[in-house]
Amino acid sequence: MCFIGDRNVAAPEEASADGFPPCQGPAGLLFSGHFMSAAIYNRKNPCLAKLKKAVRLSAPESPKDTRHYELDLSGSGMTFEPGDSLAVLPTNDPGLVEEVLAALGCSGDEAVNDLDAKPTTLREALISSCAITVIDKKFLQAIVTKVGEPAAALAELLVPERKEDLAKYLYGREVIDFLLEYPQAKFEPQEFVATQKKVLIRLYSISSSLKAHPESVHLTVATVRYESRGRKRLGVASTYLAERIDENTLIPTFINPGKGFRLPEPEATTPVIMCGPGTGIAPFRAFLQERAATKAAGKAWLFFGEISRQTDYFYAEEWEAYLASGVLTKLDLAFSRDQERKIYVQHKIVEAAEELFAWLEQGAIFYVCGDASRMAADVDRALHEVIATAGKMSAEDAQAYVARMKEEKRYRRDVY
């Protein structure tokens, strides 16, 4: 999701020439020759896009698995702007669903109503409706009620005063952990469904411009896989895209507008500074495609960082081409493990203090996209340091300078 400020989201069609619909609208209706407003698409009425292309960006030897996806929007009429996000409504991992069913002592064929009150089977509700990797407090309360004294410690965490302690306790835990820890907690199928949250929409910053790639949308996604408490954990949406879709899958999507995360008008001479390490590069790829298509005036400076140039330099040929054509004025790269001392984008920002401050004095907009937990804070500190040192200001004056940038909408963040 792209906007001024931070986003807080829970680390998931017209007929083609062969007659198969690349993208369908609500309820599977085809919109042959009739372009529909993007506003009609939402969670209840998503655009059903199809996978057009999937490419692994990170090399096989990289510890990361970052991928490039292209979804076909042909005939849907769905439009977006650089800076928008694509909402993806994923399904859960079938293997995890089977584990939950086994822990519940259910076959999966039991009749239930899902969380939209639609009749279905328990298995299908767990696949498509319930957020079984996220814990709802109703579920924990049900565990406490059913188990009694053995769950006393858990009960103590459910009082409002222990909210932070509960959040720490739940970190890295999923529904399956509690079902296995408290096997004496027995649930009827419908009762269990009622204790769950709805499967969460995942928002991905769009990494393409419609002017460069009409009727398609590109995503740059890090596949999340990790271990916690002795179990392998999977990012719901990222592994849905990486493992559970193919060219025939209808992927429910809609646009989430990034109203404040926008480029200046093409004719404006306003410089833009873009800081997007890792998958934070996504909206800036869209920005540069848009600038190339509109022959935008004004300078552009990109900061990108990853683990290694050899394994994780995403879209390298595109950046080099933009430099050569003048669409991109400057490119600074930070590959953290390519030298003894780890170097990140914030270090590159500080190294370029004099020139970067000169751009800011020319009215540059400073954009940041990516990790909110560490990167965004580190970049923010670097920005303050640049302004204080190159601008020969006190820390208080640098803070006031950044505050003015925010007021003037020249400091824009899409962090998550």
Language-model-detected regions and their locations in the chain:
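FNR-like FAD-binding dehydrogenase module
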Residues: 1-416
